[in-house]
Structures are given as structure tokens and as C-alpha cells.
Amino acid sequence: MTDLAPIKIVRLDKELPLPKRAHRGDAGVDLHATTDAVIAPGHREIVGTGIAIALPLGTVGLVHPRSGLAAREGLSIVNAPGTIDADYRGEIKVCLINLDPEKPIMITRGDRIAQLVIQKVELVDFEEVEELDDTVRGDQGYGSTGKTA
């Protein structure tokens, strides 16, 4: 055992390794593909990871693309980051997309396809009001930073 917080995990596919960090200080752990897949240019595919986890209340799992695959192959995640809520108990699946305009991407069972990052999250309730407090920024949104009136 380590001094890191334990997360309960069920390995749904016993032939795949448990998620692990490449280095102790890494934020994410690698997730592996349960099946082979060929993703055509511009297409997407939902790929299982063979694991289910039980996150504590007040945490969230975020599924991120792997930077090397994104840079080399154009492989990304459609809804990056994917969100795993604390009360979800099913298999973690990843909706991969091939952003390369020309070549298909081959996924082989066992390939590392994504990273899972566990973070604390602030759980809140919303209170409806008639108006919000004034701020210097106000309602200046998209593209407004650094511009003067």
C-alpha cells in the first residue's frame, strides 16, 4: 500500500492491467482499450476500459486524451474531458475521435487510450435571485479580455 488515497475499483476485464501512473507525481493514470477498433478520419468510437470505480462524494473523475496520441495520431476524446460522477458505478468508456483528415487510427486491445484524473469538486446548490452583484468585468464575455471601451 501507499500513502495515496485508495479508490475502489472493479476490474471487469481481468486480462487488462489496473490503471497506474507512469511516475509517482503524475496526475493521471492510463486507461486501456478492451477491444480492437479502427476509427476512420473524422469518425468516433466508444471504447470500453474494462474498469468500474467508486469515487467518494466530493470527487470527480475526468477522462483526458493522451497527449502523445493526440500529437502523433490525431486521436482525441469527443467530450474532453469526459466526466465520471461520484455516484456512477458502470464501466468507464471513452468516446474517441480521429481528428486526422486522411488516415484511420488503429486501436488494439490493451492500448493506452486515455488518462483518468481524479479531482475534488465543490458541490453547490443554486439560489435564484433577481440580479447579480456588479463587477468590473460585468457581462463582457467572449473576446473581451484586454479590450477597452
Curated annotation (Swiss-Prot):
The record's annotation in CDD domains points to:
trimeric_dUTPase
Query: Where does this protein hold substrate?
Result: 66-68, 79, 83-85, 93
Catalytic activity, per the record?
dUTP + H2O = dUMP + diphosphate + H(+)
Entry's Gene Ontology BP terms: dUMP biosynthetic process; dUTP catabolic process
Report the EC number(s), separated by commas if there are several: 3.6.1.23
- Write down the InterPro entries for this protein, in alphabetical order: dUTPase, dUTPase-like, dUTPase-like_sf, dUTPase_trimeric
Q: Give the first-level EC class, as a single word.
A: hydrolase
User: In what pathway does it function?
Assistant: Pyrimidine metabolism; dUMP biosynthesis; dUMP from dCTP (dUTP route): step 2/2
Q: What cofactor is needed?
A: Mg(2+)
NCBIfam families named among the record's database cross-references? dut (TIGR00576), PRK00601.1 (NF001862)
Q: Which Gene3D superfamilies match?
A: 2.70.40.10
Identify this protein by name. Deoxyuridine 5'-triphosphate nucleotidohydrolase
**Tell me, what does this protein do in biology?**
This enzyme is involved in nucleotide metabolism: it produces dUMP, the immediate precursor of thymidine nucleotides and it decreases the intracellular concentration of dUTP so that uracil cannot be incorporated into DNA.
| GO molecular function (one) | dUTP diphosphatase activity
**Keywords from the named record:** Hydrolase, Magnesium, Metal-binding, Nucleotide metabolism
Q: Which family does it belong to?
A: Belongs to the dUTPase family.
